[in-house]
């Protein structure tokens, strides 16, 4: 049995081997989209994504809470966090401005919904064919976190978060490793050829590790 190295290099991208060996599959019925709420800052975004969110704003505006609308009016769809990185704006130090907790009978403009299920209004509009932008790639790639080391060097790590414990259990039950669960966003970020190379390397290493 050959031990899988902790860090792999695929097409100029450094990858934690945990992305190949750990299992994950979002279990929305259990987590209720709480990742859009928990945390001390918004989701990392690029300048291009900020422009995309601003372009989609008119489409989703009526679906946002009054509190979210107020935050956006004051500081926009994004702000610089304590590390100077641009992230999505948040409400009351909690939920993303584009997240809503809705009940089947409540108006999307009503505050105080008791329904614990959180939805991304950007993704909702995208899936309804109303916008071309789905959501920031950092959201789509979770639990993978991307880090830019400079000089074109990028690293991908597995971010462990207690709120995703059900996703770990579901992924294990389905025998679904992180890199397969995140096939679409990984292709969106790095391309089909890069993802194919990742799969080939993963299959070879995992077969040797048996």
Model-derived segments and spans:
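Low-complexity, intrinsically disordered short segments enriched for Gly/Pro and polybasic residues
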Residues: 102-108
């Amino acid at each position: 049995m050959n031990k899988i190295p902790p860090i792999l290099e695929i097409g100029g991208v450094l990858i934690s081997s945990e992305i190949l060996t750990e299992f994950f599959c979002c279990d929305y019925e259990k987590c209720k989209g709480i990742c859009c709420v928990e945390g001390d800052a918004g989701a990392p975004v690029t300048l291009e994504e900020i422009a995309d969110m601003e372009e989609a704003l008119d489409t989703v505006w009526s679906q946002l809470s009054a509190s979210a609308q107020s935050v956006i009016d004051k500081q926009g769809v994004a702000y610089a966090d304590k590390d100077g990185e641009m992230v999505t704006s948040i409400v009351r130090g909690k939920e993303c401005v584009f997240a809503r907790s809705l009940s089947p009978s409540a108006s999307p403009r009503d505050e105080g919904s008791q329904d614990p299920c959180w939805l991304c209004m950007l993704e909702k509009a995208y899936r309804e064919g109303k916008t071309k932008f789905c959501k920031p790639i950092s959201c789509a790639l979770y639990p993978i976190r991307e880090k830019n080391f400079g000089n074109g060097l990028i690293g991908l790590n597995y971010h462990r978060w207690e709120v995703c414990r059900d996703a770990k259990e579901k992924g294990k039950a389905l025998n679904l490793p992180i890199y397969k669960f995140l096939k679409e966003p990984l292709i969106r970020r790095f391309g089909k050829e890069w993802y194919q190379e990742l799969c080939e390397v993963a299959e070879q290493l995992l077969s040797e590790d048996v």
